[in-house]
Amino acid sequence: MYKVEDIKTVHLEVTQRCNAACPMCDRNENGGAVNQHIRGNLKELSLEDCKRIFPPEFIGQLNTMYMCGNLGDPIVAEDTLEIFRYFREHNPKMWLSMNTNAGARTTEWWQELASIFGRMGAVIFSVDGLENTNHLYRQGVVWEHVA
C-alpha cells in the first residue's frame, strides 16, 4: 500500500483556462467555443489553494513538480509564477517543469520563470508549425509571444 511519504512527483493542473482553441483539444468544440460540459465551470488553483493542499514538509519530499493542463495552459493561470516560487522556496533541489503553447506571456514573465527554475527545471513548448501554419493547430496563440 502506498503512503503519502512515497509520493515523489506531482502533476498539477492549475487552471482549466487556455488562450488557445486547438481543434484537437477536448477543452473546446472543434476549435470553437469552450466545451459545453465545462463551460461556466472553469476553475483555477490559487497560491493560497496550493499552500493549503501542499504543506512545506510535503513539498520537501518531492523530486519533481510538473504543471501541464489537460484542459488548460498554466501560462494563463494568475498565480503560476507564485506557485512555482512557493515550491522552489520549500525544495530548492526539486525539478520544476511546465508544458505550454507559449503564446500568452511577455518576455519579462518568461525571464521571471527562468529565474525561479534556475538550472533545476524545464519548459516544454508545444509549437505545431511555423509562423504561417502554427495557427492552424494552436488557434488563438499569439505567434509574436512564441517567437
Model-predicted segments: where are they?
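A glycine-centered beta->alpha junction motif in the catalytic cores
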Residues: 127-131
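Conserved alpha-helical substructure of the radical SAM core
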Residues: 1-122, 133-145
